Amino acid sequence: MSFKLNSLKDNAGSRVGRVRVGRGIGSGLGKTAGRGQKGQKSRSGVSINGFAGGQMPIYMRLPKRGFNNVFSKDYAEVNLGVVQKLIESGRLDAKNPIDHQALKAAGVARGGKDGVRILGKGEIASKVAFKVAGISKAAREAVEKAGGSVEIIARRNVEKTDA
């Protein structure tokens, strides 16, 4: 058998037509339309989410845990190796101070409503000036060893100050 685009066919039974229920007793799915007789599940809008048939539901069996700390800081974290790659590719200019806006424009600082924090993974060879909300001890040592500088700026809700 030759294989041609005009001779392609579906496999038998791969496309089963939709069954129209409740269309007369001769179809076998008339009257109650496969829902059985009376009761909650025969009515429209059937299921009750989370209802476990009188058994204690899972969401009530498990304990309430944790809380949201209002004082927690949300930093966008960027590693030194990533910054070096951006400088080498020309997406960051080492002559200008590197801050949250510059890293966001380069596409590496996502989120971080409290600013950006630089971490020490990777190597930095360029002499750069960072203006960031936080920096790790190892990252600060690596930047200063390469001849760069670090200025910590306290920022709250960086997203709101962009406007």
Swiss-Prot record:
Q: Example GO molecular function term?
A: rRNA binding
* Cited InterPro entries: Ribosomal_uL15, Ribosomal_uL15/eL18, Ribosomal_uL15/eL18_sf, Ribosomal_uL15_bac-type, Ribosomal_uL15_CS
Instruction: List GO BP terms, alphabetically.
Output: translation
State the residue spans of region: Disordered: 27-46
Report if keyword rRNA-binding is assigned. yes
Keywords (alphabetical) are: Ribonucleoprotein, Ribosomal protein, RNA-binding, rRNA-binding
Query: Which residues fall in a compositionally biased region of kind Gly residues?
Result: 27-37
Asked if the Swiss-Prot or TrEMBL record annotates the protein with the keyword rRNA-binding, the reply is yes
Cellular component, GO annotation: cytosolic large ribosomal subunit
| Coiled coil ranges | none
Provide the assembly information: Part of the 50S ribosomal subunit.
Q: What does this protein do?
A: Binds to the 23S rRNA.
Q: Which family does it belong to?
A: Belongs to the universal ribosomal protein uL15 family.
Instruction: List the protein's name.
Output: Large ribosomal subunit protein uL15
Q: State the organism of origin.
A: Zymomonas mobilis subsp. mobilis (strain ATCC 31821 / ZM4 / CP4)
Lineage here is: Bacteria, Pseudomonadati, Pseudomonadota, Alphaproteobacteria, Sphingomonadales
